Amino acid sequence: MSEQVALNPSEISELIRKKIDQFSVVSEARNEGTIVSLKDGIVRLHGLADVMAGEMIEFPGGVYGLALNLERDSVGAVILGDSSTLAEGQKGKCTGRILEVPVGKGLLGRVVDALGNPIDGKGPIESSGMSPIEKVAPGVITRKSVDQPVQTGLKAIDAMIPVGRGQRELIIGDRQTGKTAIAIDAIINQKGTGVKCVYVAIGQKASSVASIVRKLEEHGALEHTIVVVAGASDSAALQYIAPYSGCTMGEYFMERGEDALIVYDDLTKQAWAYRQISLLLRRPPGREAYPGDIFYLHSRLLERAARINADEVEKLTNGEVKGKTGSLTALPIIETQAGDVSAFVPTNVISITDGQIFLDVDLFNSGVRPAINSGLSVSRVGGAAQTKIMKKLGGGTRLALAQFRELEAFSQFASDLDDATRKQLERGQRITELMKQKQYSPLTVAEMGVSLFVVEKGYLDDVPVNEISSFEASLHDYMRSTHAALLHAINEAGAYDNEIEAKLKKAVEEFKNTGSW
């Protein structure tokens, strides 16, 4: 006979109670949608009810998308990265976050992609935190007027088209006219000034970017620069967000009472990427097939470049930084087609920025480099930021060049010229020759001041045009070796008075007497 097992009800109920107590229920409310179509890096989802515009959507395999189109029964999103692992029928869920990138001093000296991931093989980045790529630009009350210069180290720019801290100065010209060269020279010239730089490469060849990074490294400028790359092989989505990512990285320094410089190279390619995304999302096309908000694309980016006052810096740092203003200076680059500055995107960006540096193909091909067209170039707010010596000595340069260009065109038809006209033409030729400058050889304020002084005071009038370059180089060497204290004094204060003028006059006359050029 089998042995009967005695069941004690109280023991059973105790066991059940224990099991219930130990059972953990973690519920997760998720807003999920299903992929109904996937093509050309654009995904359409059905069932995402509470998604926000610009929100990150997470897909299987750690792939993220950006919600751009919110329609009645579906959501249009653009894939950030590789979409080859996704398929129709898969789920996409809301994250409740907008796109953020790492910021901080740990990014300096590094090359990152549009999402802030390192691509230079130097290991992970120690960032100071994350910051959203889209921010509201500083308001009128929080801004401070531009009155400090950003020295580019290029005579033609610092004398005629000065750039101030917090300004937006457009560099515009056809392909292969030296636009990137000007921007890279400006970054190299910030070495030792405390200005942090961000270089955003949009739609460029990987070989070109590698060459730029190598040049920055050679000149010791990479250690104060962040390079953000959305190359030609990257998706249109990454090319579209790269400038915003770079801007956020630059704003980190501005908000802490420091000065930063950002170069967008170039915004034409960002506009093309955004046009591609908009057409794939079936948004109605407008002029040149660009969407209706193409102006807003660039204005909301460039308005974030500003100089903010000390109160705003103190507020943003919770009182940690007091009495310091912060600035973000932008140098956007626009590529024109056959010199057409009246096309849609160039006119938009010209109207947004505080001036433009116009580069001319004909000048470039005739050997005038940097090929700056002084007649079409302008700086709307930089004059207030110019140092005294540059303002005093460089003031007449622009006018003299403009008159020279006019007379040059006229003199081609005239057979005999009077003395005054001939003198003006010769002076213009000498100024044009003096404004030429080799790449990667930025000058200090004092060196530029000396060059402008000799042309302003007529010391070049008896120097043959073809010897001006060697004259200038020898003069700079002479000043560095025998008048270093004077150069140091000018560099420190940027001042120009009767005493400095007398010293410069004496030094230049001494040099001319040696005839050593």
From Swiss-Prot:
Q: How does it assemble?
A: F-type ATPases have 2 components, CF(1) - the catalytic core - and CF(0) - the membrane proton channel. CF(1) has five subunits: alpha(3), beta(3), gamma(1), delta(1), epsilon(1). CF(0) has three main subunits: a(1), b(2) and c(9-12). The alpha and beta chains form an alternating ring which encloses part of the gamma chain. CF(1) is attached to CF(0) by a central stalk formed by the gamma and epsilon chains, while a peripheral stalk is formed by the delta and b chains.
Residue ranges annotated as coiled coil are none
Which of this chain's residues are annotated to bind ATP?
173-180
EC number(s) of the enzyme?
7.1.2.2
Please provide the record's keywords in A-Z order.
Answer: ATP synthesis, ATP-binding, Cell inner membrane, Cell membrane, CF(1), Hydrogen ion transport, Ion transport, Membrane, Nucleotide-binding, Translocase, Transport
Catalysed reaction(s)? ATP + H2O + 4 H(+)(in) = ADP + phosphate + 5 H(+)(out)
Single annotated GO MF: proton-transporting ATP synthase activity, rotational mechanism
NCBIfam families, alphabetized: atpA (TIGR00962), PRK13343.1 (NF009884)
Q: Does the keyword Ion transport apply?
A: yes
Site described as Required for activity, positions?
377
Q: What does this protein do?
A: Produces ATP from ADP in the presence of a proton gradient across the membrane. The alpha chain is a regulatory subunit.
Per the record, the similarity remark reads:
Belongs to the ATPase alpha/beta chains family.
GO cellular-component term (any): plasma membrane
Protein name stated in the entry = ATP synthase subunit alpha 2
Q: Does the keyword Transport apply?
A: yes
Record-linked SUPFAM superfamilies: C-terminal domain of alpha and beta subunits of F1 ATP synthase, N-terminal domain of alpha and beta subunits of F1 ATP synthase, P-loop containing nucleoside triphosphate hydrolases
Q: Pfam family of this protein, just one? A: ATP-synt_ab
Q: What InterPro entries does its record include?
A: ATP_synth_asu-like_sf (IPR023366), ATP_synth_asu_C (IPR000793), ATP_synth_asu_C_sf (IPR038376), ATP_synth_F1_a_nt-bd_dom (IPR033732), ATP_synth_F1_asu (IPR005294), ATPase_a/bsu_AS (IPR020003), ATPase_F1/V1/A1_a/bsu_N (IPR004100), ATPase_F1/V1/A1_a/bsu_N_sf (IPR036121)
This protein's species is Legionella pneumophila subsp. pneumophila (strain Philadelphia 1 / ATCC 33152 / DSM 7513)
Per the UniProt record, the lineage of the source organism begins with: Bacteria, Pseudomonadati, Pseudomonadota, Gammaproteobacteria, Legionellales
Q: Where in the cell is it found?
A: Cell inner membrane
List the gene name: atpA2
Q: Where does this protein chiefly localize? A: membrane
